[in-house]
Amino acid sequence: MAEKKVRVGVFGIGRGRMFAQQAAAMDGVELVAICDQREKAMRDFAAQYAGVTTYTEYDRFLEHDMDAVVLANYATEHAPAAIQAMRAGKHVQSENIAVKTMAEAVALVRAVEATGKIYMY
C-alpha cells in the first residue's frame, strides 16, 4: 500500500518560496496550495508545480484539502493565522517568531490544546 503523502500549503510566497520548493521536492510531502496577496508573483511561482492551487484570500486557502500549513506571512500576523489554521483542522509551522505579546502566546497554546493539532516554530 502506498504511503499517504502529507498535503502542505504555504501562506506567503516571498519568504515562503523556499518552504514551498522544499515541500515540493520531499518524499512523502505534496505541495497542494499557496496563498499570497501578490497574485502575479504567486501564479508565476505556482506555474512551476503541477496541481498547485493558488489563493489570494487566507480564509479560502484554509478550506483547501491539506494537512498542514507553513506560515511565511508577516511575523506580526503569525499567531492569529496559526490559530485560525488550527481551528480549520490544519497542523501549522511558523517560519518566524510566532507571537509578539504574552496574550498571543497564551491564545496560541490554548488553540493547540483545544484542537490537538501540531504547532511548530
Where would I find each of the regions flagged by the language model?
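Solvent-exposed polar/charged
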Residues: 25, 47, 63, 110-113
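Conserved residues at beta->alpha junctions
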Residues: 36, 72-73, 121
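Short helix-capping segments at alpha-helix termini
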Residues: 27-28, 88, 113-117
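Beta-loop-alpha module in the N-terminal Rossmann-like domain of NAD(P)-dependent dehydrogenases
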Residues: 40, 52-111
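Short, Asp-centered acidic motifs that coordinate Mg2+ and/or phosphate
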Residues: 33, 68, 118
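N-terminal Rossmann-like dinucleotide-binding module
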Residues: 1-49
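Rossmann-fold dehydrogenase core element
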Residues: 107-121
